Amino acid sequence: MKIMRKVLCLVMAIVMLSTAAIAANACTTVAVGKDASADGSTMVAHSVDGWYDERIEIVKGGTHAEGEMVDIYRDPCQDGYREVQLVGQIPQVAETYTYFDTGYPFMNEKGVTIGEHTWSGDYNAFYNGETALFMIANLQALGLQRASTAKECVQIMGALAEEYGYADGGETLLVADKDEIWIFEISGPGMFWTKDSGKPGAHWAARRVPDDEIHSGANRSILREIDFNDPENYMWSTDITEYPKELGYWTEGEPFNYSIIFDTVEGNEAYTCSGRVWRVYDLLANSQGFEICNEEQALTQLPFSVKPDQKVTLQDIFAVCSRFLAQATILSP
């Protein structure tokens, strides 16, 4: 219960941050492995800068009859501001768990917790808003309803997206339970995908955060190279290399860098996203001397995760997420 209270307090604080946000559509996320925290808790933080539905609803779990269906609505994260469209149904499972719903659903009764940031990616190559079914908030809700661990949540969201299609832009989810944290990233199947094509309806991968490290992401794909020889620390979608190979985005024998293939990072000289990740590491791992860099440079100069200078407390995360991250730095206006 102690860990659950801390997780809930942290998530509630992040939700409150979102209500005061400006319409910049920018998000900063932080994850802390259990051996990197002061009390052995895993922690996930997510600030949402944008106009999303900040109302919190407790969606009750329960048992369900055979043949029951689940309604899927387009873009439910903004359903407080406009009508949402019913786009399809999928079969319900026998049992679901109670979860907290808001613009981006964030935690269930089993302690599975999700943070989120958007990176959109290469729309021309991967976006499919016509024949694919799920937006990211749909997958979050379904994962939280059906999963009792972080790894199971990743697997459920990935499998559903492959079967029914992913209709949103590129997204990153920080998926945690009391023991571990997985960083899940997903991109669409391309505009010509259909459910009966025999091809997966999404391209996703996930990478485990080491227990003694912290992770940060901010509106850019962060997974980097996928190690297909390390299934203990990486997961990936069916035939993930095939479509990028067809497009000429990847050549057999080269490292499979998810961030380069599915996001538009190369040649990007902005500091908008990388500056926020840099500031998190600057605050929590200052002794390592990370230097500010642009989006393209961040792929090699800012790590996926890093050991903090000292054990991280809940108060440390509150401070990181609530302060103006650029204040008194090279990025300060």
Region spans (language model):
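Long, well-ordered mid-to-C-terminal structural blocks that present hydrophobic/aromatic surfaces
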Residues: T300-P333
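A contiguous strand-loop segment
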Residues: C27-M135, I156-V312
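Bacterial N-terminal signal peptides that target proteins for export
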Residues: M1-V11
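Intrinsically disordered or highly flexible coil/loop and linker segments, enriched in small
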Residues: A20, Y166-G170, I330
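Second-shell loop/turn segments in exported
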Residues: F126-G129, N138-A147
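Sec-dependent signal peptide cleavage junction
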Residues: L17-A26
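Aromatic- and Gly/Pro-rich donor/ligand-binding loops
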Residues: C153
